[in-house]
A protein has these predicted regions:
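Sec/Tat signal peptide C-region and signal peptidase I cleavage site
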Residues: 17-22
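Amphipathic alpha-helical segments
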Residues: 23-146, 166-173
């Protein structure tokens, strides 16, 4: 993807006969739009709260497992070796299950974050296309592909305002 962008830029600037002199090229900062749009902020807040809640839940479970382990260690000399082994294996299974659950929740939150990013990009595409056609713009580049540019050709704030009007929130459930 990175090489494709570089190739496009090289072709764009190496063959000026293919581009009219009145080409209107602008850029937007996609990262800023994703992070500062109302829908993006709401999605980030939702995911942050979900992660915080899940972390609290898992911390409580971890504390219970540690207490169970300490109890088992204190009972080691009291109970039979077979019973100790049996309880130790049960505790290990609980620990493994706990770790798997924690990983599944982390993966779920990551997937929801990616889904939110895709939904924002999907909503942004028609907005950009409409804005480009209304303002006779030839090309809009992402800020991270632009090395140096004048601030006058930055459409980020304008596009951000339009996106905030058209997209209030994102469904993550």
């Amino acid at each position: 993807m990175k090489y494709l962008r570089i190739l496009i830029l090289i072709l764009l600037f190496s063959s000026p006969q293919n581009i009219s002199l009145s080409a209107e090229i602008y850029f937007i900062d996609l990262k800023k739009i994703l992070n500062q749009s109302n829908a993006g902020k709401k999605a980030q807040e939702y995911l942050k709260n979900k992660l915080k809640d899940e972390t609290k839940k898992f911390d409580k479970e971890t504390a219970l497992l540690k207490k169970e382990e300490a109890d088992l260690i204190s009972q080691k000399k009291i109970i039979t070796p077979e019973e100790y082994k049996k309880k130790l294996n049960a505790l290990r299974k609980k620990n493994i299950s706990h770790q798997k659950s924690r990983q599944m929740v982390a993966n779920d939150i990551f997937k929801k974050k990616e889904m939110a990013r895709q939904q924002l990009n999907k909503a942004l595409q028609p907005i950009l296309e409409k804005y480009m056609s209304e303002n006779n713009i030839t090309m809009v580049l992402d800020r991270k592909t632009v090395v140096v540019a004048k601030t006058e050709i930055d459409l980020t704030d304008t596009v951000l305002k339009i996106l905030n009007k058209e997209l209030k929130s994102i469904k993550l459930n």
